[in-house]
UniProtKB/Swiss-Prot annotation:
This is Na(+)/H(+) antiporter NhaA. It comes from Salmonella arizonae (strain ATCC BAA-731 / CDC346-86 / RSK2980). The keyword rRNA-binding does not apply. It is found in: Cell inner membrane. It holds the Pfam family Na_H_antiport_1. Na(+)/H(+) antiporter that extrudes sodium in exchange for external protons. The lineage of its organism: Bacteria, Pseudomonadati, Pseudomonadota, Gammaproteobacteria, Enterobacterales. It is a multi-pass membrane protein. One of its GO terms (cellular component) is plasma membrane. The gene is nhaA. It catalyses: Na(+)(in) + 2 H(+)(out) = Na(+)(out) + 2 H(+)(in). GO terms for molecular function: sodium:proton antiporter activity.
Length: 388
């Protein structure tokens, strides 16, 4: 029992459970005895009805759209705290992850196009390596435990959130043809209500969660990635302490174990089960998967490192406190873990063209993300162990 308590109290435990869940999913998805059960579980329909409102989704989409909104709520709370009271409190520190994210989206997309520009079909997947899977990136970072400077973790979270916002904008502009204006209007109204609650000094977390549920539903119905609602709600929950209590910090403390030990492992289990059936060397060495692998493994760290160097060179930003440029480069490699967001963009880019393209894209995403995780972890571990 003491060993179990020690494990769950360690900073690395969440990352270890995440990796185990992902490995289990890969194993089950590729074994004849379990693949049927695995896919049946993900495709199980779950219906939610409140009056005239009805939401029909399978288990996979409930995990990705609903449970992950809770994860993004926690991320929003943590980033807000650092923006107002922590390592991102100055303008030059706050702008650093923004500049990094821009580089981390532009360069991978250009590198992918260098491989696929001559093919008008695969060219449509240019945004696939521009995405970062914040959950898996943080999971790998967590494996290094308390050795990771808090400012570096916050930098990764802020960078990945901006990256995700960029991916959502790209999806809305280039891959979505049926945005619901009415639902977007309801979402905008809910955001105004959240802002008014904050300005009026309302400190009851439940009120924000209730309005947040309306916002989540509206964003979901609009055709935009619903997890965005979680970040927005997190930004509006009050951080200031009153009588020694902060609603944002209290909610952050409550959510952390649920996210680390239930939501993220479940997310990994639901999304990591990529089938390797039908994989051939010819397909693996085609321009589509090679472009994705190059974009994630080379383009991501190159874009982030280059733009960060330019920001520092021209004194537009500062390094996060207690970090080094080498550590920033390692985070850039970890941002090459595109995984679920990349798979989502691939399904939009090729879903109406050829299912085989989606399979090759998934394989490229899996290889690129896995290599980024291994190289990024090894690089950062070496940088953390190096003498200052």
């Amino acid at each position: 029992m003491k060993h179990l308590q020690r494990f769950f109290s360690s900073d690395a435990s969440g990352g270890i459970i995440l990796i185990i869940a992902a490995a289990l999913a890969m194993l089950m998805a590729n074994m004849g005895a379990t693949s049927g059960w695995y896919h049946h579980f993900l495709e199980t329909p779950v219906q939610l009805r409140v009056g005239a409102l009805e939401i029909n989704k399978n288990m996979l989409l409930w995990i990705n759209d609903a449970l992950m909104a809770v994860f993004f709520l926690l991320i929003g709370l943590e980033v807000k705290r650092e923006l107002l009271q922590g390592s991102l409190a100055s303008l030059r520190q706050a702008v650093f992850p923004v500049i990094a994210a821009i580089g981390g989206m532009i360069v991978p997309a250009l590198l992918y196009l260098a491989f696929n520009y001559s093919d008008p079909v695969t060219r449509e997947g240019w945004a696939i390596p521009a995405a970062t899977d914040i959950a898996f990136a943080l999971g790998v970072l967590a494996l290094l435990g308390s050795r990771v400077p808090l400012a570096l973790k916050i930098f990764l979270m802020a960078l990945a959130i901006i990256d995700d916002l960029g991916a959502i904008i790209i999806i809305a502009l280039f891959y979505t043809s049926d945005l619901s204006i009415v639902s977007l209007g309801v979402a905008a109204f809910a955001i105004v209500v959240l802002a008014l609650l904050n300005l009026c000094g309302v400190r009851r977390t439940g009120v924000y969660i209730l309005v947040g549920a309306i916002l989540w539903t509206a964003v979901l119905k609009s055709g935009v990635h619903a997890t965005l609602a979680g970040v927005i709600v997190g930004f509006f929950i009050p951080l200031k302490e009153k009588h020694g209590r902060s609603p944002a910090k209290r909610l952050e403390h409550i959510l952390h174990p649920w996210v680390a030990y239930l939501i993220l492992p479940l997310f990994a289990f639901a999304n990591a089960g990529v089938s390797l059936q039908g994989v051939t060397i010819d397909g693996l060495t085609s321009m589509l998967p090679l472009g994705i692998i190059a974009g994630l493994l080379i383009g991501k760290p190159l874009g982030i490192s280059l733009f960060c160097w330019l920001a520092l060179r021209f004194k537009l930003a500062h390094l996060p406190q207690g970090t080094t440029y080498q550590q920033i480069m390692a985070v850039g490699i970890l941002c090459g873990i595109g995984f679920t967001m990349s798979i989502f963009i691939a399904s939009l880019a090729f879903g109406n063209v050829d299912p085989a393209l989606i399979n090759w894209a998934k394989l490229g995403i899996l290889i690129g993300s896995l290599l980024s995780a291994v190289v990024g972890y090894s690089w950062l571990r070496a940088r953390l162990n190096a003498p200052a």
